[in-house]
Amino acid sequence: MSVSRWFAHARDDGPEALRAQPSPGRPPKLSAAQKRLIPEFLWHGAEAYGFRGQVWTCTRITEVIEEEFGVRYHKGHVGRLLRELHWTPQVPIRRAIQRDEKAIRRWRREVWPELLRRAKRERRVLVFEDESGFYLLPGLVRTYAPEAQTPVIREKLTRDHLSVMGGMTLGGKVYTLVRQESLNGLHSIEFLTHLLRVAGKRLLVVWDGSPIHRRAAVKEFVTQTKGKVWLETLPGYAPDLNPWDEGGWHHLKNVEMRNLVCRDLEELHQEFHLAVDRLRQKPHLVRSCFAQAGLKIQSR
């Protein structure tokens, strides 16, 4: 615009006419009402739109928007659109399709309170048992490094690991059995014997239906205890009922032992015991694992 035209604008329309006017840009492809419909479509799940698996990606959502509204978005813009709708990328919780959700709800609502009453009535120590593996390969979380310089952690490429049995009580006590070989039924007997010696003379042990718990030798051992050990099996495909699953093991691996790189199994064994000792000093945290599993302990 020439200077003379500026003066003309100012004379005819006043000084406000000289203010810069922002460009309106392209009109949005979707209206606000259409954008609000997107979460409704996504709640139906990815498989409802013909995709394999219930995982949503920006590429898949781009196709859904095109199918529903006839407009094409770049997948990068879809990410911004989702954030605008308060949808964020998250790691999903995995659940086996074989789970019987009704049986699991019934266990929490009916069986668990009855176990608490039995433990109190029969003066048993209630112990949740579970197994897990601890590998030489580190479970890295993050570390600091100069910007744009990805750090390299040197590690020994091996599948060597420690096999661990863990016991957790309502009082916040933790017991473990660590071996460098795969666990079997004899280890189950060994751990039950250990629990009888250090946890209490009468036990109510809750564990899953693992084959190492169902061996004939285990059943025979329990019979020989003459009622000192009562075993309760969790519903199938329900590791979330065990306070070890997302509680004890998760804390040990992702808090106490995160970013840990060990040279060999002996060093890993030492670090594991140090981590367990730190966990034992936090009985309140151990007890919170029961709440995380949806198990109320007020009836104790």
Each model region followed by its residue ranges:
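Key DNA-contacting residues within the recognition helix of helix-turn-helix
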Residues: S4-F7, G79
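Acidic/histidine-rich, metal-coordinating catalytic segments
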Residues: E129, L192, G200-R214, L234, ...
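Basic, flexible linker segments flanking DNA-binding modules
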Residues: L18-K29, R80-A119, G139-P146
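Key DNA-contact positions within bacterial/archaeal DNA-binding proteins
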Residues: M1, G76
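RNase H-like polynucleotidyl transferase catalytic core
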Residues: T150-K156, T223-W244, L260
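C-terminal anion-handling pockets and recognition modules
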Residues: E122-L126, G133, W244-R300
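Extended, low-complexity cationic-aromatic segments
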Residues: R106-T193, A293-R300
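A short, amphipathic alpha-helix used for macromolecular contacts
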Residues: G25-Y73, K120-R121
